[in-house]
Amino acid sequence: MNIIKTGIKQSLVSGIYSKVGIRAFCTHYSAELEWVKLSDDNKVATVGLSSFGAQRLGKINYVELPKEHRKCRREEKFGVLESSNATAFGLYAPVSGEVLEVNEKLKKSPSLLNEDPANNWMVKFKVSKPDEFKKLMDSNKYKKFVQWYR
């Protein structure tokens, strides 16, 4: 029964990948310790702090995020985290775009990034250059990067 379900699921997913592109379904990572998820239509990038980044920084005490509608170029600083292990840790745009939304909950509860970094995003960008997403690391490259970083 599981084999059949798995086979159906895999072929269904393979069909979706070929229509939309694999980028829409994978989490990618920046060298600035951020995770990035691209929407199904490749127009919105959701950005958060990676688990490794949260671990490395220690307890996050303060989050400064950009205002909505701000335009950022790839690798441009858009915010700051302050933590027990880093006085100020810069946040950099993994792709070029306009800030659509910021996670306001983080301003009141910055420790959410420590508690569940995978599900507590920081910023959503309207992507202006989708090809820049290819410059980010997939999970395998990120694992190697993290090993080197340690």
Swiss-Prot record:
GO biological process, one term: glycine decarboxylation via glycine cleavage system
Residue ranges of domain Lipoyl-binding in the record: 44-126
Chain ranges passing through the membrane: none
Gene3D superfamilies named among the record's database cross-references: 2.40.50.100
InterPro entries the UniProt entry points to: Biotin_lipoyl, GCV_H, GCV_H/Fam206, Single_hybrid_motif
UniProt xrefs under PROSITE patterns: BIOTINYL_LIPOYL
Cellular component aspect of the GO annotation: glycine cleavage complex; mitochondrion
Similarity remark: Belongs to the GcvH family.
Name of protein: Glycine cleavage system H-like protein gcvH2
Gene name as annotated: gcvH2
